[in-house]
A protein has these predicted regions:
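Soluble FAD-dependent oxygen oxidases
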Residues: 2-496
Length: 496
């Protein structure tokens, strides 16, 4: 794809961001203009957005509408690190609950509050200097992709495949993505951060400056140590100029199970040069699945890698060799509109045995509300390879022996009356998810991905951080001893 076309596509995808930060501060309700809030506005170069502002819902609503009642008094649209520092100091001094929001896609409303949302949405610039990429905290995947270097030499910051997801939250939780098997995690390419601390001071962290903090910010998840405002990355050179994308669709319990086994075989064939997922669900007509991904090769070599999927007799398929940038854009999947859902994840270190696919497809077939709700599963093959070349304790991201993410997905319709938003999962769907979890546990290492936060985890800190938890707790005590940055699944302070 020509560069102009690539930039046009990415630019069009980013138009919505401009609308969110443009315009002035509308007059707020009288109750919201209390003295303390007026004091905050005077300290900001950005604006406070109140509930009567047309931007409010888009800026304040949680990604997961299970938590739609959790709306803030106001959103601070910060324009600079000084704005962020002022907002943190103000929230602490006034004892106002607050949450940090970049992209706003936290599954469990970790970036939501009834008090003040400190938003970095208005800080979304990126800058390139050779193979070094500088980004503000509000930048999204699409913003950074649009400034990647031009010409014959292709460079990449490996990240997620959702263009509208914030890069800061992605990075702080590790940052898996479709290029991770050959390029590593987003966090593995982080070289320096600027952060506002619990006292409102501004610090930097890198391998040589505040190294314990820097270690923690590469996998310790967002909202635990401070507010990251700026990030510096080192790009990786793309090793190929062409890639082959693929889609294979299957329907029926037997065919879907067969496709899952074929997907594992294809991954073994492709090694770190293949990535993708086996995504299966239950519709009114029965169980279906789609295997979708890319291979960093073309021609007969790609066909050989994909041979197990071709031999599995899909209902429909598309295999196409493209320029690398075309393949990169093809793989990107915008996040769906805000909806009501509950997702759970487990890491697996080995391929699943054949019987597991029979068990999974039968359980999908038993989903209690086909047509009225959604029940699904994803065998996500974005791990192994370069990710696992890094020792588990070298960064806070501990899951360096995993090969797969096993992701349970469920979603249900939103009620028409916003006063009764369903914070609870429907009983039959909850039972189905819990049974699914029990089915998958024996195939997992019992760890979960911290960027897919799950309120149902009984020991979330161990599941997210494993052997790195004690060190993370010590760093938490060093940088936030009063637990100013907290939420239901925040890293705990060490026991006294």
């Amino acid at each position: 794809m020509a560069d102009l076309t690539r930039r046009a596509v990415l630019g069009a995808a980013g138009l919505g961001t401009l609308g969110l930060v443009a315009g002035g501060w509308s007059s707020s309700p009288a109750f919201a203009r209390a003295d303390k809030w007026a004091q905050l506005q005077r300290q900001l170069t950005g604006r406070l957005v109140w509930s009567d502002d047309p931007r409010y819902v888009r800026l304040a609503q949680p990604r997961n509408l299970r938590y739609a009642a959790l709306m803030p008094k106001a959103v601070a649209l910060c324009k600079s690190v000084e704005d962020v520092a002022a907002a943190v100091r103000w929230a602490r001094d006034t004892d106002t609950p607050f949450a940090i929001r970049g992209g706003g896609h936290n599954y469990a409303a970790g970036s939501s509050t009834t008090g003040l949302i400190i938003s970095t949405r208005g800080m979304a610039r990126g800058r390139l200097d050779g193979a070094t990429l500088y980004a503000q905290a509000g930048a999204r995947n699409r913003d950074l992709a649009a400034i990647l270097p031009e010409g014959d030499d292709l460079y990449l910051l490996p990240g997620g495949n959702c263009p509208n997801v914030g890069v800061t939250g992605l990075t702080l939780g590790g940052g898996i993505g479709p290029n991770a098997t050959w390029a590593g995690l987003t966090a593995d390419h982080l070289r320096e951060v600027t952060m506002v601390t619990a006292t409102g001071s501004v610090v930097t962290a890198s391998a040589s400056v505040n190294p314990d903090l820097f270690w923690s910010l590469r996998g310790g998840a967002g909202g635990n140590f401070g507010v990251v405002t700026d990030l510096t990355y080192e790009l990786v050179e793309v090793p190929v100029r062409r890639a082959t994308t693929f889609i294979f669709d299957f329907t029926g319990v037997d065919a879907v199970s067969r496709a899952g086994r074929a997907w594992q075989e294809a991954r073994r064939n492709g090694g770190r040069l293949i990535s993708g997922s086996w995504f299966a669900g239950r519709a009114t007509g029965g169980v279906w699945c789609r295997v979708r991904g890319q291979v960093l090769m073309g021609g007969q070599a790609a066909s050989d890698v994909l041979a197990p999927l071709i031999a599995a007799e899909p209902d429909a398929s598309e295999v196409k060799t493209r320029s690398w940038w075309d393949a990169y854009l093809w793989y990107r999947t915008p996040v769906s509109p805000n909806n009501t859902f509950w997702d759970r994840s487990l890491y697996a270190e080995q391929d699943l045995p054949g019987r597991a696919f029979d068990e999974i497809t039968r359980h999908l077939d038993a989903f209690p509300q086909p047509g009225r709700a959604f029940g699904g599963f994803q065998l996500l093959g974005w791990l192994g390879g370069k990710v696992n070349d890094v020792p588990a304790t070298q960064t806070a991201y501990v899951h360096r022996s995993a090969r797969w993410i096993l992701e349970i997905m469920s979603g249900w319709a939103n009620p028409t009356d916003p006063s009764v938003w369903p914070t609870r999962v429907p009983a039959d769907i909850r039972e189905w998810v819990e049974q699914f979890w029990d089915l998958l546990l024996p195939y997992s290492n019992r760890h979960s991905y911290q960027n897919f936060p799950d309120p149902a985890l009984k020991d979330f800190a161990r599941a997210y951080y494993g052997r790195n938890l004690p060190r993370l707790s010590q760093v938490k005590r060093a940088w936030d001893p009063d637990d100013v940055f907290t939420y239901p699944q925040a890293i705990p302070l060490p026991s006294r």
